[in-house]
Amino acid sequence: MSILFYMIFLAYLRGIQGNSMDQRRLPEDSLNSLIIKLIQADILKNKLSKQMVDLQENYQSTLPKAEAPREPERGEPAKSEFQPVTAVGPEWLRHHRRYNSPRVLLSDSTPLEPPPLYLVEDYVGNPSVANRTARRKRYAEHKSHRGEYSVCDSESLWVTDKSSAIDIRGHQVTVLGEIKTGNSPVKQYFYETRCKEARPVKNGCRGIDDKHWNSQCKTSQTYFRALTSYNNKLVGWRWIRIDTSCVCALSRKIGRT
């Protein structure tokens, strides 16, 4: 199509040149050479375009075909949220330490101290363990006396009897209490932090302007991995919610700006 256009255009130019008396005629060989060059340029352009298309098709054919993501079946947890467990033993516990977290502990004895890097000021210990008074006295020595106060008062302790929880998908799951690993069974302990009371002072959180704000201390939760079962089957690691902090919730009083 483009070659035909060139031919018509050149014929048009030649007709104009023939009607003009002031311009000299182009030699016949010059006009022919110009036509040949235009035709060669058009052929080369079409050839390059075809080569580019072939290269793109060859490249697409060499790429591996992407598999469509498989939708989880009904009742089947997602891979990123659930790791099944076939058998629990000392070797298994040693190979799955990467799932351990500071707030979830697998141990054959009740922990007596808070996890590393956690504050000891709000640790209340376990009332069922002996020598609790001595430990609390020892922890009290670490408290600061710089006149600093928290907006909310919290307390932390090891929960030894957690039986159920809500996982990251909103399902009610059963927390494995005792895990048999031979001669010494282990238990799961959860280091939880919660509010002592909703209103540490008369009007809510400490240090909040009660003329403009309503305030209340609330326990906040975070997801941690734990060994659980769903519908008495599918035992494995899941993300569950546990109490981890005490925060102050604010709402502006009506009519205040």
Swiss-Prot record:
Q: Name one GO cellular component term.
A: axon
Question: Which example biological process does GO assign this protein?
Answer: nerve growth factor signaling pathway
Q: What is its main location?
A: secreted
Q: Glycoprotein among the record's keywords? A: yes
Q: List the disulfide bonds.
A: 152-217, 195-246, 205-248
Q: Kindly list every residue the record annotates as glycosylated.
A: 131
What the entry lists under InterPro entries is as follows: Cystine-knot_cytokine (IPR029034), Nerve_growth_factor-like (IPR020408), Nerve_growth_factor-rel (IPR002072), Nerve_growth_factor_CS (IPR019846), Neurotrophin-3 (IPR015578), NTF3_N (IPR045815)
Q: Which domain of life is it from?
A: Eukaryota
Q: Which GO terms describe its molecular function?
A: growth factor activity; nerve growth factor receptor binding
Positions annotated as propeptide: 19-138
Coiled-coil annotation: which residues? none
The membrane spanning regions, by residue number, are none
> Signal peptide span per the entry?
1-18
- Keywords for the protein's UniProt record, in alphabetical order: Cleavage on pair of basic residues, Disulfide bond, Glycoprotein, Growth factor, Secreted, Signal
Residue ranges for the region (Disordered) are: 61-81
Biased composition of type Basic and acidic residues is found at 67-79
Q: Does the keyword Disulfide bond apply?
A: yes
Q: Which Pfam families match?
A: NGF, NTF3_N
Q: Where in the cell is it found?
A: Secreted
Summary of the function given for this chain in its UniProt record: Seems to promote the survival of visceral and proprioceptive sensory neurons.
User: Hey, which family's this protein in?
Assistant: Belongs to the NGF-beta family.
Protein name per Swiss-Prot or TrEMBL:
Neurotrophin-3
| Organism annotation | Sus scrofa
List the top taxonomic levels of the source: Eukaryota, Metazoa, Chordata, Craniata, Vertebrata
